[in-house]
Amino acid sequence: MMSGVMTAVSNRWDPGAVRALAEARHGDAFAVLGAHPSDNGRFLRTYLPGADRVSAVLDDGQVVALDAGPEPGLFAGELPAHGGYRLRIGWPGGEQETADPYAFGPQLSDFDLHLISEGHHLQLADALGANVVEVDGVRGTRFAVWAPNASRVAVVGDFNSWDARRHPMRLRHQAGVWELFVPDVGPGAHYKYQLRGPHGHELPAKADPVARRAELAPGTASIVADPTPHQWSDDGWMATRARRQAHDAPMSIYEIHAGSWLREAGLDLDWDGLADRLIPYVADMGFTHVELMPVSEHPFGGSWGYQPLGLFAPTARFGTPDGFARFVDRCHREGIGVIVDWVPAHFPTDAHGLAHFDGTALYEHADPREGFHRDWNTLIYNHGRREVSGFLIASAMEFLQRYHVDGLRVDAVASMLYRDYSRNAGEWIPNIHGGRENYETIAFLRRLNEVVREHTPGAVMIAEESTAFPGVTADVAHGGLGFHYKWNMGWMHDTLHYAGLDPIYRRYHHGELTFSMVYAYSERFVLPISHDEVVHGKGSLLGRMPGDDWQRFANLRAYLGFMFTHPGRKLLFMGCEFGQPTEWNHDAGLPWHLLDDPRHRGVQTLVRDLNRLYVQYPALHAHDDDPSGFAWVVGDDAGNSVVAFLRKGKRGDAPVLVVINFTPVVQHGYRIGVPQGGQWREVFNSDAGIYGGSNLGNGGSVTAEQQSMHGHAQSLPLLLPPLGAIVLTPYG
């Protein structure tokens, strides 16, 4: 034993350091705690508030009792110059033996820190956050957080009674990262960071921005994630994904809110339960993809996920991160792609989140004219800061690489692109050239899309962008933003307004039906009938349709027929596929009982058949981005509210003729010019009895007559059903 060298221990404590440790203010705990060289070997200091006694257990088994210091919880003593040790701690409730967190050197490599500071660490959650690791044979968790302006950071959790005095962290100055390896802490541990700002003021405890797992709301703690990787079984899907998601492939997306698609006994399904029920349904309906409203962890369920704080953690509302991986895996095994809504524009002001994270505007702009979004009461990311843009890009890569997600739908792009978005004069700051474009965001989006294309080939990036900003889907090399697709908000607004008009007035708004083809090839588009169109007093898709009950259903069927044959990928929000009559309510499940009603079941059958038609006929998807794939046949018959157009595929693909009558008046002998003679099959009719229609049509086929019309030598005399869409294709 070395008790003889303990007489001078009380003189080894600096009063200022003792006070700073006791008040959880010391910014360099490693300078005080742990074992430091001394005249007699090493002098060990520990600070374990609440402990009754502490000993050092040396590698050779010798036990050195540490003397109590000048403050409760402080213990110190002399150790030999060499050799390891463990701490044996006596707590009021028992004894614990563990390694000393302050016996370990710096954890993150200089290269990691360089990548973090440059915003280029694509596996950011492998460096920052909470990672279960083994250091010098000791198992534990390495905590690391970016907080360059904090004067002190400690990790607090259920492993230290949430005591900010227990585990102050080490600052790695070159990157502004604080780190600490805490032995014996493993998966499932709850934790936060306790920070002091640059002037020493204590901040609210913060959740980990890079945590891979979070506590179920309303809890706000982060959780140490299980490091065991998911065992994927989707090799076949991943090998063919690039082909399945190519520009000339069909893409029909079913958008869902995971918490309200189906509820059992008033409760959300978990990821496994959702997979059990959703995947067979999506496959049966013929959708090629599901799109999940944001699954990143978010504090307020009423935001639907669009105000996230945990950009690396699938929300705990539906289970564990591995549960989410299992869901994606099972989708892939059934040939269904998974797109996730992702929010890099803004974040909520919750005290435990990113707001004023280290006592300064770290993730957000300091000036509210740049950093505060009044429409949503949220803070706006500073995309011009390397570490922030790198944080966001790493979040995107986390979902695309770790979870095999097939694409991201980037939310609120327009709000990022323009400095004056939703602001009046004097409420925004111009760019360096005096303009309204946000150059920093443009650079961020370009780099994001370049990184995705380089590191996750075959994944798609989709922009929700509601303005005419040029080149959203153009290549970055050609001055574009580099997205694969863009939501066609113009098509959606125009056609929904048209469809909501009484048919007697539609002749005066015919351009709303046809105008989309003027710009249809300026970008690569998705036609979105999303959740945004069935909330906030807009009513349901069915509820927008005019007329009596029969006409509303017929209008809806005709509108869906128009959507699925118009150039552009398809997106349909859950409930729209069976004509939900009320607005979507995120607190309730969909009204599935309505499928007992043949009218709603008919709409569902129609959408199922439209999906199969869309996939079966290349003319309906192969040339969505090529003007050669579309030709108006009748685009100017405003008086009858009739449109007709040809969709054309690649060489050898049969053309498809689409004719839609947007009035309740049956058109007999309506002649349409066609490019070839012979018989044309009626392969779809929205007025079919199986869909709930009146069963008026063309008896399954029509023979072309040698009567020129619309620039063609032959034409078809057609019966156009009321408020109906028909699709024909030549035999052979």
Swiss-Prot record:
GO terms of biological process kind: glycogen biosynthetic process
SMART domains: Aamy
EC number: 2.4.1.18
Taxonomic lineage of the native organism: Bacteria, Pseudomonadati, Pseudomonadota, Gammaproteobacteria, Lysobacterales
SUPFAM superfamilies assigned: (Trans)glycosidases, E set domains, Glycosyl hydrolase domain
Catalytic activity: Transfers a segment of a (1->4)-alpha-D-glucan chain to a primary hydroxy group in a similar glucan chain
UniProt keyword Hydrolase, yes or no: no
PANTHER family attached to this UniProt entry: 1,4-ALPHA-GLUCAN-BRANCHING ENZYME (PTHR43651:SF3)
Its job: Catalyzes the formation of the alpha-1,6-glucosidic linkages in glycogen by scission of a 1,4-alpha-linked oligosaccharide from growing alpha-1,4-glucan chains and the subsequent attachment of the oligosaccharide to the alpha-1,6 position.
One cellular-component annotation, GO: cytosol
Family the entry assigns: Belongs to the glycosyl hydrolase 13 family. GlgB subfamily.
Protein keywords: Carbohydrate metabolism, Glycogen biosynthesis, Glycogen metabolism, Glycosyltransferase, Transferase
InterPro entries (alphabetical): A-amylase/branching_C, Branching_enzy, GlgB, GlgB_N, GlgB_N_E_set_prok, Glyco_hydro_13_cat_dom, Glyco_hydro_13_N, Glyco_hydro_b
One MF term in the entry's GO annotations: hydrolase activity, hydrolyzing O-glycosyl compounds
Pathway: Glycan biosynthesis; glycogen biosynthesis
Subunit structure: Monomer.
UniProt keyword annotation of Transferase present: yes
Protein name from the UniProt record: 1,4-alpha-glucan branching enzyme GlgB 1
HAMAP family (alphabetical): GlgB
